[in-house]
Amino acid sequence: MKAMILAAGRGERMRPLTDLLPKPLLAVGGKPLIVHHIEKLKAAGVTELVINHAWLGHKLVETLGDGSALGVTIHWSAEESALETAGGIIQALPLLGDEPFLVINGDTWLDLDYRSLVEQPLGEHLAHLWLAPNPPQHPAGDFALQAGKVVDTPAFTFSGVGLYQPAAFAGLPAGARKLAPLLREWMAQGLVGGCLLAGEWRDIGTVDRLRELDEQLQRRAQ
């Protein structure tokens, strides 16, 4: 299985930190957010990765290179300007191949065994989404779970972690495109499975949340 890490966003709410670095390179617990993902994916047996980039993307490429220093192979998908989630996936489809692939937001942090993600069967679904308890900054939630399927009713928050069939995006035109409208189309057809994440999830969307997680990880390491 291949995995795609989304790393093209500007990170406006993280300025001024993201004036100098792309958000996935911001460090928590002594290493960049994106490196936490890469190491956990490798531990789960996923060694072929696709990473998209736009804002300060050259710094991601300079830092991670071809991935060999981390024991993985990285294929880069450069975007002239950020294409949103679905647009980024559509552009990267030739790099992702014909098998189901995992997608993870590069500006999140997960404390769980990534094998639970990699070993998830898709069955007849076009997508499988991992949901999380609603964080304080998003109390309403996004979607709900109903008999193993995700439905368009606010209850839990979409973690950004998903498993997808390439066919779900095949034939869609190139260009900027959000993922949520596609997900809702598939949900209406009963084609989106889901479950709750079996571990901790953090959306690192502000400087304060980055600092809070970094301090927490440093305390754990003592």
What kind of feature is each model-predicted range?
Residues R10, G106-T108:
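Active-site metal-binding loops of divalent metal-dependent hydrolases
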Residues M1-D19, K42:
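N-terminal nucleotide-binding beta1-loop-alpha1 segment
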Residues V46, L102, W109, R115-L122, ...:
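Catalytic-core segments of class I nucleotidyltransferases/pyrophosphorylases
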Residues L20-V35:
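Short catalytic helix/loop segments, enriched in acidic residues and glycine
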Residues K2-I5, K31-N105, L145, G171-A174, ...:
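Conserved N-terminal catalytic core of the sugar/cofactor nucleotidyltransferase
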Residues P24, T73-H75, L126, L191-G193:
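Conserved beta-strand segments of alpha/beta enzyme cores
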Residues W55, H128-D142:
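Short beta-strand-to-loop element that shapes/binds the nucleotide-sugar donor at the catalytic cleft/hinge
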